[in-house]
Curated annotation (Swiss-Prot):
It comes from the Eukaryota. GO terms for biological process: tRNA-guanine transglycosylation. Heterodimer of a catalytic subunit and an accessory subunit. Non-catalytic subunit of the queuine tRNA-ribosyltransferase (TGT) that catalyzes the base-exchange of a guanine (G) residue with queuine (Q) at position 34 (anticodon wobble position) in tRNAs with GU(N) anticodons (tRNA-Asp, -Asn, -His and -Tyr), resulting in the hypermodified nucleoside queuosine (7-(((4,5-cis-dihydroxy-2-cyclopenten-1-yl)amino)methyl)-7-deazaguanosine). Zn(2+) binds at C324, C326, C329, H355. GO terms for molecular function: metal ion binding; tRNA-guanosine(34) queuine transglycosylase activity. Belongs to the queuine tRNA-ribosyltransferase family. QTRT2 subfamily. This is Queuine tRNA-ribosyltransferase accessory subunit 2. Binds 1 zinc ion per subunit. Pfam families: TGT (PF01702). It comes from Drosophila virilis (Fruit fly). Its cofactor is Zn(2+).
Amino acid sequence: MKFVLKSISKNSGRLGQLRIKQSKELQTPLLLQTTKGGSIPYLSAEVFDLVSQEHQQVLQLTLSTMDQMSESLAQWNRSLSDYVGYPGYNTLLLLRDPCETTPTGGNDRDVVPLFTRHGKESLTAARYMDMVANFAPDVYQGLCDADTNPESTKKRVQKSVDRTERFMELCYEQHSKLARLKDSTLLAPIVGGYSTFARTQSIKHARQQPAGSYGGYILEGFHTNGLAATELKAAQLLPIVEHCVQQLEEEQPRLMPGAYTPLLLLELIRLGVDVFDSSYAYCAATNYKALTFSYVRDKAEHAAFLDVTDEAIKEDFKPLLEDCSCLSCQKHTRAYIHHLYKTHELLGTILLMIHNLHHYMCFFEAIRASMAADQLPELIEHVRMQNTTAEVNYRIEPNNKVVGKAAMGKGFIAAAV
């Protein structure tokens, strides 16, 4: 993997180009496509191709949702992207699913807990590297203890750093020995919770490795994934990230997985983080929210979301978002998608996922354009206020509404009698 900086600005972050193997150059800041079990959630490969036209794509795969495929992949002699049905796509393998809350605990001295749909599996560093070798992704993260959050104690934070160092010693060794990983790039994990001292220790351990041992950094241990990432406070997170990036080489890309809010994501980009994922769009769709925030500076007021469970839109025949060119907005209305929610139709979530992914990919195009014009601060302020009088709240609230049978109507069969 090769990363080249195109420009860097104190106010607008850094633009770069990332090339994975022999792929086309990928522009950074880059949006990774979050997957579950190797598939884009709710979308077939054919539908996703329609959604992602003219957008660059890298698949973010997770071991916690694909662990059962390890044995069959060991016998696979083609690329991982071919195996999951997305031939030609670059692949990046993570340990944990950023879309779902990762349970805490289960951290023994020499193992990391892997929470899968089959239960908890204890991974040693040797077992982890064997599984990664079976997958043979283009890029993968080193094994780390990232079980920390804003409430973690100093003792838990220090343990996460010490254990990660032990895991990574074997990961660095095996990365150079395993034949199936000779074309793969290792990302060095930077952990340490919200302690600048612990983060510095983690960074020093990575930078002590011989040149070429790894090809980038992944900053972990800020949250427990899922909706927890949307609740992070900028005042807590940003100083720690800034402390980290100041100690990292400029020529190495930096990845931060998680469903960060659009506003916090922009602030992280300003600090110098290069790669993110689409888990925020997924979390919004699964909680019946269509992304409607504006990333084009205008004078109209905008909201962060449209809640399709709201009874107020049951007779609203406008698209989810005016002037949106996605398939959902071109073909369907708010009232119809509200009806799909009330009748528990899977198509409702599919249409929301199509819209949210399209909106988020276009958001990243706007980010790169603003950075090229050195206008990222103006975009941050626009996203922050959305032309309203108060800062917009981008936190995703879990949908706990229950649709009763009475609200679903009599149904077609009963109505025909």
